[in-house]
Amino acid sequence: ITGSNLVADGINNDRGMNEMIDSFLDGLNTFKAEREACLIYGSEPEVPMTRVEQMVAEMSLRDKVTQMLMVDFRDWNSKDFTVMNDEVRQIIEDYNFGSIILFADNIKETEQSYNLTMAMQEAATKDGGLALIICADQEGGSVYRLGSGTALPGNMALGATYANNGTKYAYEAGKIIGSELGILGINGNLAPVVDVNNNANNPVIGLRSYGDDATMVGELAAASIAGMAEYNVIGTAKHFPGHGDTATDSHYGLPMVDKSLDVLMETELAPYTVAIEQGIEMIMTAHILYPQQESDKIVSNKTGKEESLPATMSDDILTGLLKEDMGFEGIIVTDAMNMAGIADKWDQVQSCVIAIQAGVDLICMPCRLYCQADLANLDKIIDGIIAAVEDGTIPMERVNDAVTRILTVKENRGILDYNAEDYTLEKAQAVVGCDANREMERELAAAAVTGFIAKENVVGTLAVCFVGLENLIDTEELAMLEGAGAEVAGVLAITKVAA
């Protein structure tokens, strides 16, 4: 090999290397240009969509909006709605509702309840429709919907078991509720109440609360939610940010809680922090004013005046506090929108639009739906929400986020894969109100019994209500109460102690 050949080979090698470098640089420039285009136009390199993302992308705007509604058929044509009829079946088939709420008027007996929920899901899933979140307020105690179910004591009784038993009985109660609802096809429970009972004049919470200790309330609520989740029943913490420290019932008026965020974090919000850490999937809002957290006012179409925004309609509270600061990724559902706390001051369309803007994902009972004529009002609400999306009042991203949250919970709880063959009447009859559940009910009630030791004149300062003491009439225990100054009235032993 001559020297000239070596030089020539070197030149050729340099040319080849230069060509390779040029090719690499061309490719790099192309990649950079494509990446810049992605950033400019908001697109990203293709990533496979999740199942839920694909479903949301393929849904019409109307179907997205109706998926954000939880409706009730509490009665139909002035009669309790307990058996599916052709009118309601057609409504469910046509509207693609996300959820239906049931009341005691709807679920009286096991076989009847089973047949009703199965018929609802059959109508909802016809022709490829999405299965429903079917809910009830099965709190236990005074708020109790399932007529044939196990009649568990209320939350305050569970609170009474906490000192000696920790969260044991709250978990067992959650399991009983979850097993009985779930086997009937009721896959959502609008419970537990996680309000802290820190106002003795509260007319609506009281015994529905676990108690006045925020830490205890959070732990018991988390245990109850975990028990329900074992049976794929969605638990709901309510009423955010807190309905405990009020003297007004939001069913009949608009309460106010005037507290700083620091104070709320120590009391009202503490149980929600625990519930969110435990993976709670649904939180219900409160129709309550929180002026230190939301000071904005909006002119109401109903009153013609500027009205303060309750938590249900507050962006600062629902999006800023609950979703962003507290990290909640589940479904925000309203309390019933026909309650006076909302309905007295806002028309139905405006209240729903503002609530969705604020961060609500699921609207509970936007209007009554008790006869065929009520559909006109429902259509007005749906059309009003659609119009608000189309004119930009409600961003499409907000709607997509809401529907994504709803479908994600449905996917996680197996509702998207609903199969009627997973349910049988025989299974339901074997579980609802079964002997094992009744035995746990009695054990829980016994564990909740609390003794009070009276020291001079203490009893005389208390007003006490004993419920279910019919077995104590004419017994030594009752004589002891009377001897302590109690005045006993009635077979149910409602006792009123003289002050």
Regions found by a protein language model. Give the residues of each.
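Flexible hinge/switch segments at interdomain interfaces of large molecular machines
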Residues: 149, 191-199, 240-246, 284, ...
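A substrate-binding/cap region within the structured catalytic cores of diverse enzymes
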Residues: 159-186, 193-214, 221, 225, ...
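A short aromatic-anchored loop/beta-hairpin motif
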Residues: 93-104, 291-292
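Preference for extracellular/luminal or secreted protein segments
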Residues: 17-93, 314-315, 324, 343-499
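Second-shell residues forming the walls of enzyme active-site clefts
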Residues: 60, 83-84, 109-128, 132, ...
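Generic enzyme active-site microenvironment
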Residues: 70, 135-136, 236, 333-334, ...
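Conserved functional hotspot residues or short segments at active or partner-binding sites
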Residues: 1-22, 388
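Substrate-binding cleft of extracellular glycoside hydrolase catalytic domains
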Residues: 123, 132-171
